[in-house]
Amino acid sequence: MIRARACVRRALFFVSLFFFPLFAQDARGGVERGVTGINAERPASRIPFINFDIREPQTNREVAFSVQLLLLLTLISLAPSILLLMTAFLRLSIVLDFIKRALSLQQVPPTQVLHGIALFLALFIMWPVFTEIYAKSFKPLTDGQVDIQTAYTEAERPLRVFMYRQMAHDPSSVRLCMSMAKLPKPDTLADVPTYVLIPAFILHELTVAFQIGIFLYLPFIIVDMVVASILMSMGMIMLPPVQISLPFKLVLFVLVDGWNLLIDRLFHSFL
């Protein structure tokens, strides 16, 4: 009987140890909720109220503002395409992919890494252009010194100069796009519309990138041919030459300081 009572007491003791923290936590939570309810009228931080009201425009100024807002949203949605096709990113990404294939590398470096390298190199090359756009377009617009039309013109001019400067030595792409648009032969940059200059720049960048790719492939093709001829002379026809030539390609690329040489030539090709 005494043992039974002792067991019951021990059981009640352990139960109280288990449930007492839960009750204490619940009671503390109730107190905190009560305090929160008392201080509910005292917000810790002020959050601005934002209201999007869709209604009929009352004045012509409201109509113009709505159109400008739609144009701004359209420009923001086109920002990735502008970054990919109207900057140095197109040439850089294609050339980096060419060097990866010329070295017979399948997964190293990954495609996402190559695109990241091309993106930051493009930002590095385009930084003076972006700085000029910020100083002459974005900052005056935010300060209220110019309107949206003037800001657009000032932002467009540095990009047009950059694209036209790349095609100054070979304006064949400009002539081709001007002829397809049935426009007269331009004498200056101002005579080339932007909707013609952009596709001409894209065609020029594709042409230049493929020309660079040809020069990148030539030394590594020679290595492949030498390795293949040696394997055939030794009777190892079933052995893939790519597996044997890959280390020699890597050694050649490292010995000539390939990455620094490639990035340096790409950078100076835009100057």
Curated annotation (Swiss-Prot):
Please indicate which superkingdom the organism of origin belongs to. Bacteria
Enumerate the PROSITE patterns for this protein. FLIP_1, FLIP_2
Say where the protein is mainly found: membrane
Q: Which InterPro entries match?
A: FliP, T3SS_IM_P
Task: Tell me a GO biological process for this protein.
Answer: protein secretion
Tell me where it resides: Cell membrane; Bacterial flagellum basal body
- List UniProt keywords, sorted A-Z: Bacterial flagellum, Bacterial flagellum biogenesis, Bacterial flagellum protein export, Cell membrane, Membrane, Protein transport, Transmembrane, Transmembrane helix, Transport
Q: Which regions span the lipid bilayer?
A: 11-31, 70-90, 113-133, 190-210, 212-232, 236-256
Q: How does it sit in the membrane?
A: Multi-pass membrane protein
**What Gene Ontology cellular component terms go with this record?**
bacterial-type flagellum basal body; plasma membrane
This chain's function reads:
Plays a role in the flagellum-specific transport system.
The family classification in the record reads:
Belongs to the FliP/MopC/SpaP family.
Q: What is this protein called?
A: Flagellar biosynthetic protein FliP
Give the organism the record lists: Treponema pallidum (strain Nichols)
Q: Which gene encodes it?
A: fliP
